Amino acid sequence: MKLRIATIAGLVVLGSGFAVAQTDVIAQRKAILKQMGEATKPIAAMLKGEAKFDQAVVQKSLAAIADDSKKLPALFPADSKTGGDTAALPKIWEDKAKFDDLFAKLAAAATAAQGTIKDEASLKANIGGVLGNCKSCHDDFRAKKS
C-alpha cells in the first residue's frame, strides 16, 4: 500500500514537472517574440518619420532579430502545442519544416540587411525582406487577435 501511494505521488510530481516545463518553453518563446517585437519598434518609427535614422539602432535591432530567429524553432517542441496562454496555431506542428524555414529566412534577411542598410534610403529599400518574413509567419502560424 505504501509503495502504491509513493508511486502515485511520484507520478503526480513528474506530471506537474512536465506541465511546468511545457509552460516554461511557452514563456521563453513569448519573451523572445516580445523582444523581437521591441526590436522592430525603432525601425518602424524611422520608417514612419517619427524618429531620425540611426544606423547604430538599426544594426542593434537587426542583430537582435537575427539572433532571436535562430533560437525560436527549438522553443516550439511538439509537447508545447497546448497547456499555456499562446497564440501559436496547430499549423506550426503540422508544417514544422516550413515554420522553421521562415525563421531561417528571417535570420538571413536580418543579417543581409545589416550589411546593406547604411542610411534612410537603404533602410527603406532593404527592410522589406525582414518585415515580410515577420508578416509571413504571423499570417500563417499565429492566431489572430480578437
UniProtKB/Swiss-Prot annotation:
Which residues take part in binding heme c?
R29, T86, A87, C134, C137, H138
**Gene Ontology biological-process annotations:** electron transport chain
Mention any one GO cellular component term assigned to this protein in its UniProt record.
Answer: periplasmic space
| GO MF term list | electron transfer activity; heme binding; iron ion binding
Where does the signal peptide begin and end?
1-21
Q: How is it modified after translation?
A: Binds 1 heme c group covalently per subunit.
Please give the Pfam families that the UniProt record associates with this protein.
Cytochrom_C_2
The protein's UniProt keywords, in alphabetical order, are: Electron transport, Heme, Iron, Metal-binding, Signal, Transport
Q: How does it assemble?
A: Monomer.
According to its UniProt entry, the function of this protein is described as:
Cytochrome c' is the most widely occurring bacterial c-type cytochrome. Cytochromes c' are high-spin proteins and the heme has no sixth ligand. Their exact function is not known.
Name assigned to this protein: Cytochrome c'
Q: Coding gene?
A: cycA
